[in-house]
Curated annotation (Swiss-Prot):
Residues 6-65 bind DNA. Disulfide bonds: none annotated. The lineage of its organism: Eukaryota, Fungi, Fungi incertae sedis, Microsporidia, Unikaryonidae. This is Homeobox protein HD-3. Its main location: nucleus.
Amino acid sequence: MSRKESKAPRTRMTAGQTRVLMSFFKDNPFPSTTAREKLSKVLGVGPRTVQIWFQNQRQKARGQAKVSDREEGPRACTGSECLGKLCILACAAISRMEEEAAWNLGH
């Protein structure tokens, strides 16, 4: 069996699934196994898919923090600290506050 044949097909999340996951991610980028299992049941995808989604989002947050640091200077932390759990939580909180402020300005 070739490598391509053994690989599972890519799971595409719907817009609704993504909204639920992003909302949860903003509150808790590091969900417990139990929370991931509950999310997987609600969303109709496997727990491993939810786990990978959260890993990918945390990596994306790290990358965005690095780019932001290069462009604007460090906001919440510097150097290797930006790769840590606290920075991801801080970046998620900042992102949520910015979104809420933008929403409040629009309404």
